[in-house]
Amino acid sequence: MYLSDNFKKHSKYPSTNAVHVYAVIAMCLGLKNFNLNDSQIIDDVNNGFETRRKFFRRLLRCIDMLPNAYQVAQKWNISDHDKRVKDGSLTYDYFNVSEGKIEYCILKCVYIEMFEQYGIRSLCKIFCMTDTTSYENLPKHVRFIRHSDLSDGSCCHDEVIDKRRIRE
């Protein structure tokens, strides 16, 4: 996998870690050989990264104690958007930032492309779920709405809402 032309092509995006993504793809393909279904594979891979995610969750919970936690999340989103547009790893239909809300729709994603080339597009949900994991750990300040993602839909449409500013 790491010697393939596709790996070389995907390594050109600095905002993605192709080595890490390809390792996850290899794990998924290996688990597929045991006739596991997608949800079992996703659970197994996520369980393998549990220690790393626990640290990340703790950090997010600390951030959620800050009065400006939404602004921190907003800066992450804007920074991530700018990096990914610059390197071409994501193609946005739109990315709107307004007072207390970010809404975007992603039409093309290099992560999806990497998984799709191995016939396991649906397993890219492992990476799509990182947003959900992030925002569910900011419950005091952020409401995250995922309308769709690219692992099983035609776009990734998300809303990140400041709970203190917008009442729904």
Regions found by a protein language model. Name each.
Residues 111-114, 164-168:
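Short, charged/polar, Gly/Pro-enriched secondary-structure boundary elements
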Residues 154-163:
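C-terminal edge-of-domain segments
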Residues 19-25, 29-118:
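Amphipathic interaction/junction segments at domain boundaries or subunit interfaces
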Residues 18-21, 166-168:
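Terminal "cap-and-tail" regions of soluble proteins that handle hydrophobic small molecules
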Residues 9-17, 121-125:
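Short, charged/polar micro-motifs that form catalytic or ligand-binding hotspots
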Residues 1-14, 23, 27:
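N-terminal leader/targeting and assembly helices and adjacent pre-domain segments
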Residues 91-145, 149-151:
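Short, hydrophobic/π-rich interface segment
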